[in-house]
Amino acid sequence: MNYNERSHAIDLITEINSYLKDVNLKIKKAGGETTLKNNSEIHGKTRKILFPDLLLFGDENKSTLMQGWEIKLPDVEVSDETFINDAIYKAEVMNLNSTILWNFKEIVLYVKNKDGWKIHKKWNDLIIINNRDDVVKHKELWIAFLKDKFLVELNMYFQNGKITTKPLYEITDNIIAFLINDFKKNVGSFLKENAKHNLEIQAYIKKWWSFSEKEFLADENDPFVAYAKTILLSWITRITFAHVISKTHNKAQLLNVLDKNTTPEQLNNLFQEITEESDFYTIFQKQKYDELIPDDVWKTILDFNTFLIDKLLTHQVLQNLLEQTVDRYKREIIGQFTTPEKLAKLLVKMTVKNLNSPILDPCCGTGTIPKQVRSYMQSLDISESNIHNNIWASDKMNMALQITNLALTSTESMNHINKIFQKNIFDLNSEQKITFTSPSDGSQLNLQIPRYTNILSNLPFIPFEIIDESDKEKISSIRLKIKDDSEGKIQLSKKSDYYYYIIIYLHSLLDDSGRIGLILSNSWLATDSGRELFKAISFYYDIESITISGKGKWFFNANVMSSILILNKKHTNEKSERIIQFIMIKDNINDLTNDEIDIISRDYLLGESSDYYNKSSYSMNEIESFLSKNISLNSMFFDISWIHKVEKIILPLNNLFKVIRGMRRGWDPLFYLPKDNDVEEEYLVPVLKSARNIKSFYAKPDGTAFCCSKTKDELKAINHQGALNWINKFESSVNKTGKPLREVLAKSNLKWYEMKPDNSLAEFITSINPGQRIFWSKLDKPSFINQRLIGLNIISSDKYSKDLMLALLNSILGLFFIEASGFGRGLGALDLQKNNIEKSYVLNPDLLSNHQINLIINSFKNLGDNIPKDIRNSIIDPKRVEFDKTVLKCFGLEEIYLEIRKSFLYMINTRLSVNN
């Protein structure tokens, strides 16, 4: 927009506002003067402008946006594509469904409907204005048209709802999204270009990415573009927050006088000055290299600042703007890892019994849990002073703390300290002092970390394989402390995930009446390492409850199932007789209303039953008895009180079978051959590759494995060219990470291309990750199996009939023990481990007479050969019911059939509900 266009646009704004003073229309104010002044060129080139030349508002404070206008002079026709596209682009940015094209000759109203942007009306009243001189010459004419006709007609569209309006915070959220998506690649490329001349930039961003890739920015794979997003969001967030606090912080008001010549360095210096008089360091802290931003992008960021300048915003609008900015930051940067608000609310209300006491979230992420604590306190009329005195939040990652600080700040709390700080959880102790800045006078305050009455957190899920090197020494000391405290009775596995150690470490931060509420992955409920964790937790705490979902995932975009663990600090290491509650919430938390969450937490705290959850309660003695039979903690959410009735008819599975895991060699294309191949017969071994191909209780191999132990020279000597060619085909190949197969497949006592099936032959098999099909299948003769299968071999093959063993394994009790050994993954599959199957139980065949054996085998044969597609349907089929009752009757326990079936079906339905 050139000077003449800007001048006439400002005249237009002035005339609209003079008219609106004397009338009562839906339109209350026009604006845009400030952003017009910034619409300069960059090095002689035009740049993309986000904001319309003129804005109409629905209130005097300019907090409700109605419409944007694009202004040109008559020499630009309203049919000009660039003119039209610019107007529509800016309307999209503002999330508005209409726009005006005004060139002082013709005026066009575009409205967006389901078919896109369409001309809704065109005004030709000023057709005599043909050039720039005419605009001045006929000024009275276009002013009269504007006031007497156009604004009146336009107002009617707002009155009848044809044109929608948007509150400022929604507009701002949309603008932020456009800023990020339009400019992240530009900024990323600019960073890369600068990194060519300064390798420190590249080193810093790559190191940052090594920490951030797994936890942040799941939608980005270029570290420079990902870092560009953090730079853009940092500028936008700081500018927005400075405007929010400008009424109570004089320095922040200096943003109102920034102009198009302000540099990133100057604005960073201003934010530093604001920080010195406030406690918002984590918000205003400079991002490293944030000054490396292209001029056109920087001018647009200044436009955004200018857009916010003249808005006289109420406290509520400011708060909405603040919360919307926080939500946008979460979506753009952290996404799937953010704790859902309703889950955070439930955690807080189930755990906290005393709100007037210190509360900590040591892995606060974006502050969802502390924010829910704050809301809970506000609902009970606890003063802002007490709220800020008692809420503490920390995190290892500084980026997350910026959002936490925003989340805990309101327009009513500007003069209170947010006790938010960066610290590795394993470095926290109650003797430390943390330095904060008083927002009221800028003074430095050293506050001691207290013993906490409540600790609440969504603990990070970091597998043991990728635990940071800097934490390994601390983790080793925690493992040693557990061993020493328990006199060697409890030893956490070295394969324990990161959060295991956090749970134990938190004990040192609690006061004597302390409670802990944690959101965890559910994997610990059915693994060997999880059992050791359970022992360790029971040693240091009274476990009050474990809660899971009975319907679907709690985290929308992450393929994990979760649990809530609530603990009370134990005062003695003596064995507790406390009853542990296993709670399963019937509906997905995210589908519940806030009132329903209140009811759940109230019923829970009162120890009452509830319409919203099922509860099973067991003593430690009962739990230890279940665990001794390899029934996982995950199974205890269901009524399995009948288990003690079967104790005399079952025995450990490894008394009868040797359990094997199928062969894992590392590169299937090499070791599993296509049907058409030229490899010599002696190197071909039938293999069962996948449970997916098993349709019958009597399985057959479904593939061919390459098993060659000869050297290449030996193959050449006997002219086995087929095997030699097959090996040569892969000799120069690399894996998915670019490493040579010769290196990654190398094993002691094996050639890199060698696979020996000897220890992977099985008589019975099942899937390692069953879904709806849970079964055992029998092979005609021991066959080679792939890593995706678990196999069994009868130890005393001359003593037990294979047909009998197949029937007992597939009985309802046999299948129950499979389901009870594992836990549900985020996609609904059951996660089994060889170790868990090995420790599982089966019906004892030694208790059966020959007559009973024949009854069971014949009843099983009546089911037919085919494995049912869904066990839930087949289990209630009359023939299947007859078979299961026959088995139980032979063992003298037919009366508990329905109890077993109910538990079994409920467990499977819950696991598979994630796919609903």
Residue ranges and their predicted role:
Residues 1-17:
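Nuclease catalytic cores
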Residues 224-251, 457-458, 500, 508, ...:
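P-loop NTPase catalytic cores that bind/hydrolyze ATP
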Residues 94, 99, 106, 110-149, ...:
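Signature of N6-adenine DNA methyltransferases within the class I
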Residues 26-62:
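Active-site metal-binding core of divalent-cation-utilizing nuclease and nuclease-like domains
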Residues 248, 276-350, 824:
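Class I S-adenosyl-L-methionine
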Residues 52, 57-59, 63-88, 92-287, ...:
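Charged, often flexible domain-edge or linker segments that flank or initiate folded functional domains
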Residues 811, 851-916:
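Amphipathic alpha-helical coiled-coil/heptad-repeat segments
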Residues 624-862, 869:
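Polybasic, glycine- and aromatic-enriched phosphate-binding surface used to engage nucleic acids
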